[in-house]
Amino acid sequence: MKLIHCADIHLDSALATSLTRQEARRRNDELFETFIKMMDYAQREKVRAVLVAGDLFDSENGREAVRKKVLEAVAAHPQVDFLVLSGNHDGEQLFNTAPDSGFNMTVNGNSLPKNLKLFPGAGKAYRYGNVVITGLNSLKLPSNLHLKPEDTN
């Protein structure tokens, strides 16, 4: 199984500490272009999944337009699963999909792409043959997490 693992992409960052507004905008564009190149590479090389281990976005209050662009990119690569764990920057409501949030992101009026895999709550797992990918916050180790020794966890 081919897997791309990445973390701390921080899309839509203010980048205000050492860059001018124009430089920050250009750098954010570069980061997003690199994200798209990674997705294109994954599809071209028949990668089964891209795993983002936290902080895809720089803030949980990021711009909706940027989040929608990410969803469109994921939807445009349906052969690649896109597994996303929330980090300390982008928060638990990564795509505002909680039933009580009152808002659900869509792509062109459709619900979230089927190849977008999130990890709500403790112990959510996705199986690829005998490979199991489980996403959880290591600060909150769940007692209900049951891993099988014969699997690659």
Where are the regions that the model predicts?
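N-terminal active-site segment of His-dependent metallophosphoesterases
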Residues: M1-K69, A73
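His/Asp/Glu-rich metal-coordinating catalytic cores
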Residues: A49, D58-N153
